[in-house]
């Protein structure tokens, strides 16, 4: 039996935004919740800057790469929650694991409002099921995930052999996984596969140009 034809016209994958050092360091940068509470499981200040800047990247009021689309469906890795912990302003449990991906897309989701469908049901390790769900979405999809597992997601996407996907998430000069790129997959109905490209965000000072 042949695989079903994907419905998602565009799939855009990003890593969550910047985080504090691991293990948490005594000096800054610290992780902070949206209300400014120190929390090493949250984004750093630079991470929140990127999360805000991504709104205009994906929902532009100015020209951006034409291949970038305003997402209609947004996936972020499931938060490892603890029902006894309080929620922050975004509605995520304070002190829980995995929240940075949801924090990264929160400003985008707020801007889009009810026009976007959010899915936080899939955990790390559920990449195959998650991308199968994403490819069945009838419109542009944005996925925010932990960078170590993004190649697992990409490996499940049928990609044109002329645009192969790297085996690992790109690193900066220090060997750390980059925060400033988008992996873009555009569906080619004639080939029933996706064309892959690597798009730099170029949002913050220090972002790499390619």
Where are these regions (language model features)?
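Active-site-proximal alpha-helix that buttresses catalytic centers in soluble enzyme cores
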Residues: 3-138, 149-210
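Mobile, glycine-rich extracellular loop/lid and propeptide segments
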Residues: 141
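Short beta-strand segments
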Residues: 144-146
């Amino acid at each position: 039996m042949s695989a079903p034809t994907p419905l998602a016209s565009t799939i855009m994958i990003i890593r969550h935004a910047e985080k504090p050092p691991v293990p948490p360091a005594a000096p800054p940068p610290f992780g902070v919740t949206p209300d400014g509470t120190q929390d090493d499981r949250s984004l750093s200040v630079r991470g929140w800057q990127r999360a805000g800047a991504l709104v205009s990247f994906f929902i532009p009021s100015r020209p951006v790469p034409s291949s970038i689309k305003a997402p209609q469906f947004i996936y972020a890795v499931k938060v490892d929650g603890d029902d006894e912990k309080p929620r922050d302003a975004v509605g995520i449990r304070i002190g829980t694991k995995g929240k940075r991906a949801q924090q990264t897309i929160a400003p985008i989701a707020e801007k889009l409002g009810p026009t976007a469908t959010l899915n936080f049901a899939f955990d790390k390790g559920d990449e195959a099921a998650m991308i199968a769900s994403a490819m069945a979405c009838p419109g542009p999809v944005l996925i925010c995930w932990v960078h170590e597992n993004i190649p697992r997601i990409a490996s499940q996407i049928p990609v044109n052999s002329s645009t192969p996907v790297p085996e690992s998430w790109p690193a900066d000069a220090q060997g750390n996984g980059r925060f400033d790129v988008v992996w873009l997959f555009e569906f080619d109905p004639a080939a029933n596969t996706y064309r892959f490209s690597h798009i730099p965000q170029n949002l913050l000072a220090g972002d790499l140009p390619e």
